[in-house]
Amino acid sequence: VQFCYALNPNDATINNYMGVFYDAFDQPQKVLPYLKRAFELQPNEYWYQYAVYLLQSDDKKLAKLAICNLEQVAQNNPKDEDIHTLLQKAYIHVEDYKRALLIQDQLDSILGYNAASAMQRYRLNMVLHDTKRAISEVERYLEEEPNDIQFQIFRLELYEETHQPSDKMIEAYSALLPHQPRNWILLNNLAWHLCISGGDLVMAERLSQTTIMAEPTNSVYLDTYAWIMYNKGNYQDAFFYIQRALEYAIPETKKEIETHYKAILKKLKL
């Protein structure tokens, strides 16, 4: 290759090979000039190795140079998936997540909107701490694929984090329930939201009963069941279960359980 380079130093392919070989033989100081020259000679052909090598460095200036070059190539090849994918990775590398989201729009125009797109949009919005947009993206995908369990979980986690209204929580928990019927946390939380929202107390009782049968010393589950009994007007049973909840309470749950305990005592006039 060196012989070929000596004969034709302005051949893009030879320059690219020189860079690749020096990289393979761990001579980094010699790699960049050849890859750069190959790119300069034929940017639409030899952009990949040059950009990848620039992005491997921790030097932000080199990463920004890669972005500049990739933007140029992307303009000349607006429908090339590989270019835009690497360009998006480059923006993520320099922590320009808003620009990475804009590149996702271009990728969607090439590949169509799909699970990978929705996942990327969800992740980027979460990195940007834009939970509202993250929720919107998850809900958008679930409109097309309502049975996607992973996105149902994402939605539920986001709803919990942002304290969404009970009707939205009930919808999210109910959608996931058929896929995870033995997830006691899910059953308990659905029962709780049905209870506090004035929903189906019969269903809430059934769900909550299942959890305390599975984990009879779980103070949170016992408290939920006691509060369902309270809302049904069954104060004797409510008192029995709230006492058990207090017996097994941990510091993180004790305060709310004590609040419910006082409310039940008031109804019993004790």
Question: Where on the chain are the PLM-derived regions?
Answer:
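Canonical positions in the second alpha-helix
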Residues: F3-C4, R37-A38, Q72-V73, Q106-L107, ...
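Residue-level recognition of tetratricopeptide repeat
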Residues: V20, V52-L55, K89, R123, ...
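Alpha-helical adaptor scaffolds
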Residues: I153-T162, S174, P178-E215, V220, ...
